[in-house]
Amino acid sequence: MISQFFILSSKGDPLIYKDFRGDSGGRDVAELFYRKLTGLPGGESPVVMYHGDRHFIHIRHSGLYLVATTLENVSPFSLLELLSRLATLLGDYCGSLNEGTISRNVALVYELLDEVLDYGYVQTTSTEMLRNFIQTEAVVSKPFSLFDLSSVGLFGAETQQNKVAPSSAASRPVLSSRSDQSQKNEVFLDVVERLSVLIASNGSLLKVDVQGEIRLKSFLPSGSEICIGLTEEFCVGKSELRGYGPGIRVDEVSFHSSVNLDEFESHRILRLQPPQGELTVMRYQLSDDLPSPLPFRLFPSVQWDQGSGRLQVYLKLRCDLPPKSQALNIHLHLPLPRGVISLSQELSSPDQKAELGEGALHWDLPRVQGGSQLSGLFQMDVPGLQGLPNHGPSPLGLGPASLSFELPRHTCSGLQVRFLRLSFSACGNANPHKWVRHLSHSNAYVIRI
C-alpha cells in the first residue's frame, strides 16, 4: 500500500504527482524528497529513506526519479518491484520513458496510475490486461535524426541501411493509434552488458564484474511464440563445460517466469510467449574471469615541478578490442588537485576534446577503433600543490581515473544470440521483422593513477 507516487526530473522538477490516500503533506513531500536526496554526502542515493513518519522508496530511470511513499511498514522489495514494473508500463504505453515522453503524455500516465493502483493498492501491472481499459492514445514525437537518413546503425556502427531498424523503431507505444491500422509485427531483442572494472596503479586487475541482460520488446500479437537460440558453448558455473572450446561461462543466471527451459540444457534454446511490451528474458553475472582482454588500458605518466607548481600529465589510452570492433562515446574523468588555474593540451587527433570542470579533467573521444591507441598531453599550473601532504594512494591528489564508453556489437562475456525464430502462424500473413542487437557499456571502469 502506497500513499503517493510522483516522478521528478533530474533537476527535481515534478512531472507527475498522485496522492492515493490523502494522508500526506501534499506536493511539498516531493520537494522534501529531492532536498534530502541531493543533500547526502558523496552523491549517495539510497533507494529507501525514512524521514519523519514516512518511507521514501525510489528508482532512477533515464535520469528520472520514480518515487513511492508510504506510512505503513511495507516490504521495500515489493515497492521496488512495483516501481520497476511501473517504469516498464510507462515505457510500453508512451513508447519510451524519459522527461520528454512523460511531459507529452501526462493524461495517459494519470490514466495508467488510476488503473494500476486503487487507494494505494495494486490492481494489475499487466500490459496486456490494461489494453482493455486505457483509452488515451500516446503522443509520439519523432525527432529529426541523421541516423534515419544515413548508413549509421542503431549504436553508431556503419552498416547497410536496409539491414538495420530506424533509430526510433523500438520507441513506439505498444497501444497503436486508432488511426494507424498498419502497425508492423516486430520484435526487438537486446543483449546488454554492464562492465565494472578496478585496475591498480601498476596495471594489475583488482576486480572485474559483468552484469548482463537479454531484453525483449515485442509488438507481436499475444500468443506468438518466440524461440531464442544462445551460443551452444554457453555454460553456467565453473564446473560445467560444453563443446570443445573453453566455453562461454557465467557464474549465475536467472530467467523470466514465462520462459520455457525444456531445451535449454540440451541445445541452449529459450522458448516463450511474451505479451506485447518489454520484459527481461534472462539475467546473468560473471566475475573475475573474462574470456577476452579488457576493452581499455590506460598508461599514465605524471611529472611535477615543485618549484614552478606545474603539473604535467601524459595519458595514453589503448583499445584492446578486435580490429573490426570499435568503442563509441568514450569519456575519461580524472580528478585533479585543488587550485588548478590553467590547462594546456596536446591531443593526438582533432576530433578529441578536453576541458576542466568541477575539479577534474574531462577528455572526450567520440570513436576509438579496436587495436588503436590515442594520447593526450596535459599541462596544468597548480600553485597550491606545493603545500599538499605526501600521503595516500596518489600523493599529488590525482585520480583515480574513470572511463565511460559503449561497445556496439560486442559482449564482454562472449554470449551471442545464434538465432531468433518467431511463430509465423500466430502473426498472421504479415512477415514479422526481427532485430537483434548486442551492446556492452561501462558501469564503473576505474583506473588508479
From Swiss-Prot:
Its main location: Golgi. It is a peripheral membrane protein. One of its GO terms (biological process) is protein localization. It comes from the Eukaryota. It is found in: Golgi apparatus, trans-Golgi network membrane; Early endosome. The keyword Cell wall biogenesis/degradation does not apply. Keywords: Endosome, Golgi apparatus, Membrane, Protein transport, Transport. One of its GO terms (cellular component) is clathrin adaptor complex. Residues 184-448 form the MHD domain. One of its GO terms (molecular function) is protein domain specific binding. PANTHER family: AP COMPLEX SUBUNIT MU. Component of the adaptor protein complex 4 (AP-4). Adaptor protein complexes are vesicle coat components involved both in vesicle formation and cargo selection. They control the vesicular transport of proteins in different trafficking pathways. AP-4 forms a non clathrin-associated coat on vesicles departing the trans-Golgi network (TGN) and may be involved in the targeting of proteins from the trans-Golgi network (TGN) to the endosomal-lysosomal system. Belongs to the adaptor complexes medium subunit family. Adaptor protein complex 4 (AP-4) is a heterotetramer composed of two large adaptins (epsilon-type subunit AP4E1 and beta-type subunit AP4B1), a medium adaptin (mu-type subunit AP4M1) and a small adaptin (sigma-type AP4S1). Interacts with tyrosine-based sorting signals on the cytoplasmic tail of cargo proteins such as APP, ATG9A, LAMP2 and NAGPA. Interacts with the C-terminal domain of GRID2. Interacts with GRIA1 and GRIA2; the interaction is indirect via CACNG3. This is AP-4 complex subunit mu-1. It comes from Mus musculus. The gene is Ap4m1.
